């Protein structure tokens, strides 16, 4: 693969370690990612056809959050060498020398094992098994293998980030139904255009670290075409909950308008290929994609959790 990545030695690239404070250990958990995981898991629980005891639900969400944090921590432990090279990550606790790698490894493993065991005891072992699979997939399959080996890294690795709704549904029902699967697919297809939009702007940073992101391997033009292709899949897929009966009028409007906006922004990325306008188009898509996913899942949460569900008469005949 990349000689640069393989030649990086954490002992050589990381600053001398000192004692980290609580904020540094919390930063290892990637709190923004953790919040998104909890949110999508909550939606997975909410759209399930049955209900769960509120205490069990709250404990389960906490354990899902801890498991997600463990994944982030183990990812930062493994990626400390390349984090030290990339501009946007060099201030993270390990490359900045505030936390030693072995401290992060121990912290991550304890959280991973503890979260899985507690989720199994609080809810059920299917949910715990899915959480364990998510942690292993993100840490071993994505972080340790795919991220440095293939331009399809975030496509395949995106499965880890798409699993929380299925875990949430498993907490409630002890199984995984069509609702959890559809939400998984929405996040899975959303992931490539979201990350590749950022990669178009940060391609030099990724190249410096030796990470084979799509723009660096297939080129920016191919990446732009693939962004449009995935968005063409995402827009109609976002309407699937309406067709399957667990998304109503509010959700349908959000999915329709949001999907159209995603298409418009992806086409702008495809057209604007040089200079500042190209970067602006890519960052606009990147930023809106976050809002799109948030609004999509918020609409489901509002309809199912707050009783705002209004079926679309046309689809009901």
Swiss-Prot record:
This is Protoheme IX farnesyltransferase. Its EC number is 2.5.1.141. It comes from the Bacteria. Pathway: Porphyrin-containing compound metabolism; heme O biosynthesis; heme O from protoheme: step 1/1. Keywords: Cell inner membrane, Cell membrane, Heme biosynthesis, Membrane, Transferase, Transmembrane, Transmembrane helix. It catalyses: heme b + (2E,6E)-farnesyl diphosphate + H2O = Fe(II)-heme o + diphosphate. PANTHER family: 4-HYDROXYBENZOATE SOLANESYLTRANSFERASE (PTHR43448:SF7), PROTOHEME IX FARNESYLTRANSFERASE, MITOCHONDRIAL (PTHR43448). Belongs to the UbiA prenyltransferase family. Protoheme IX farnesyltransferase subfamily. It comes from Methylobacterium nodulans (strain LMG 21967 / CNCM I-2342 / ORS 2060). One of its GO terms (molecular function) is protoheme IX farnesyltransferase activity. GO terms for biological process: heme O biosynthetic process. GO terms for cellular component: plasma membrane. It is a multi-pass membrane protein. Carbon 2 of the heme B porphyrin ring is defined according to the Fischer nomenclature. The keyword Transmembrane applies. It is found in: Cell inner membrane. Coiled coil: none annotated. It is an enzyme of class 2 (transferase). The chain crosses the membrane at residues 25-45, 54-74, 117-137, 167-189, 244-264, 281-301. Converts heme B (protoheme IX) to heme O by substitution of the vinyl group on carbon 2 of heme B porphyrin ring with a hydroxyethyl farnesyl side group. InterPro entries: Protohaem_IX_farnesylTrfase, UbiA_prenyltransferase, UbiA_prenylTrfase_CS, UbiA_sf. Pfam families: UbiA. NCBIfam families: cyoE_ctaB (TIGR01473), PRK04375.1-2 (NF003349).
